[in-house]
Regions:
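Short secondary-structure boundary/capping segments
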Residues: 1, 60, 87, 110-111, ...
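NAD(P)+-binding Rossmann beta1-loop-alpha1 motif at the extreme N-terminus of oxidoreductases
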Residues: 1-58, 63-64, 68
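Hydrophobic/aromatic beta-strand patches that form the interior of the parallel beta-sheet core
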Residues: 34-36, 56, 96, 119, ...
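Rossmann-like NAD(P)-binding element
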Residues: 60-89, 93-94
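Glycine-rich, N-terminal phosphate-binding loop of Rossmann-like dinucleotide-binding domains
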Residues: 72-74, 99, 149
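Rossmann-like NAD(P)(H) cofactor-binding subdomain of soluble oxidoreductases
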Residues: 83-133
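Internal alpha-helical scaffold of NAD(P)-dependent oxidoreductase catalytic cores
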Residues: 139-167
Length: 167
């Protein structure tokens, strides 16, 4: 997993998304990280800090080459982004989220026929603070990280995702 052609997309770079992105940047500095966030200050900071390499502006095109896409926005927004990602992510992409509740996103994944790509996730971390400025490259380190793969996602994808999380 040290391939410099490896690309990871993030939709939402708040406390959790920002922390995961910062951790991946620290461990895998050669990976390409693409970020999208509704807050222009957040996305500007992530780019200026070298956490992301480019800013995504369109879910339908900007995540097409990603090996992973992390949905790190609030749950109701993550569900909305799925429609845009359907048909645009590549066949090898692993799609995941970090939301604390799973029923709504799993139902939408099933409805859209995206089950072979999706592994739900939730790192058991948090802070009384919120936002990218409070994210840390070590926030999710050594934390419990629950995963909820669909029944149709392959064992290899689950194994690959667990490997990324362990690093």
């Amino acid at each position: 997993m040290t391939d410099s052609n490896f690309t990871i997309g993030f939709i939402g770079l708040g406390l959790i998304g920002g922390s995961i992105a910062k951790g991946i940047r620290r461990v895998f500095p050669n990976y390409t990280l693409i970020g999208m966030d509704e807050n222009p200050d957040t996305i500007k900071s992530a780019l200026e800090d070298g956490i992301i390499d480019s800013i995504a502006t369109d879910c339908k095109t900007d995540f097409a080459e990603c090996n992973y896409v992390f949905l790190c926005a609030p749950v109701q927004y993550n569900v909305m982004y799925l429609k845009d990602l359907k048909g645009s992510i590549n066949e090898n992409c692993i799609l995941t989220d970090v939301g604390s509740v799973k029923e709504e996103i799993h139902l939408k994944i099933e409805e859209l026929g995206m089950e072979e790509y999706f592994i739900g996730g939730h790192p058991m971390v948090g802070s009384e603070k919120a936002g990218f400025s409070f994210s840390s490259d070590r926030l999710v380190e050594n934390a419990y990280y629950f995963i909820t793969p669909t029944k149709k996602v392959s064992e290899q994808r689950v194994k690959d995702f667990k490997t990324l999380l362990k690093n």
